[in-house]
Amino acid sequence: MRFIYACDIHGDTNKYERLFQKAKEENIEYIVLGGDLLPKRGIRVIIQPEFIKGFLNEYFKKLNDNNIKCILIPGNDDLEKLDIQINELCNRYTNIYNIDNKRVDIENVSFIGLSKVLDHPFGSKNRVLVEENLKMQPQLSEDIYINKDTAIITIEEWEKYRQTNVDKMEDILSNLPKADKEKKTIYVFHNPPYGVGLDVCANGLQVGSKAIMKFLEDSNSYMSLHGHIHESTRISGLWYNELGKTICIQPGQTELGEGKCYYVIIDTELNKQYRYEM
């Protein structure tokens, strides 16, 4: 199986188009998108539903017309309350698979996805989790948005709220669909694991999940695909590493409007992966 993997497109239509053209040029049947599909600029409650209904619908149709399948998860910047709309769109097409908290078996591969991320400094607490011994980072916004971005609380209220009202990464991972032992398992987790160079912020802070790190170490899975920290590859110099027998990949991404798009082409038969920019 050969596929293109990219993440953190954030509604950049030029990047979407480049990935489509690359799949056509290379005769690749699959595109895997690792979260943060929708625009994050402006008023997201208005822009993101319009993007799903308009561009994303037409994009999925174009992929279908060209016999290209797309496997995807949302990310923390994609409003959780729009999951119903995303699922309805994906269900219109037989070539589109939303694997958030689900498993899909394609050819000799089982894909299992998770959109959730650890609590971060940003005010929009969309899809965030905590884990054992995770300290709250200094917050960049005085207003904290919870309950799918509809309720606003203070930083002090959030500090108390997250202690009892936010799920733990360990629990979410333990309840994921089980892998098919007869197939190669690829996890698509928006949050990268801790400590293997795929989670490094511009300030050098490692913000990956220790629970995901342990999960992958114990899983004996074939591969895991990540995103979330756009600049990590630039800061650490690493876009892949290994945890036990699991190959972990984080291609990184440029910001909206910047010229380049980072992606990886993966061949599960030849056990090879190559990172590109275009």
Positions of predicted regions on the chain:
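Core catalytic region of metal-dependent phosphoesterases/phosphodiesterases
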Residues: 13-106, 251
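Extreme N-terminal starter segment of soluble prokaryotic enzymes
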Residues: 1-4
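Active-site-proximal segments of metal-dependent phosphoesterases and phosphodiesterases across multiple
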Residues: 38, 42-53, 179-220
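Active-site environment of divalent metal-dependent phosphoester hydrolases
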Residues: 10-14, 38-42, 72-84, 103-105, ...
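Acidic/histidine-rich helix-loop elements
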Residues: 7, 38-51, 121, 125-131
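Binuclear metal-dependent phosphoesterase catalytic core
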Residues: 104-107, 210-218, 232-278
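Proline-aspartate-enriched helix->loop->beta-strand connector
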Residues: 28-32, 212, 216, 220-226
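Active-site-proximal loop/helix segment associated with metal-binding centers of metalloenzymes
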Residues: 109-202
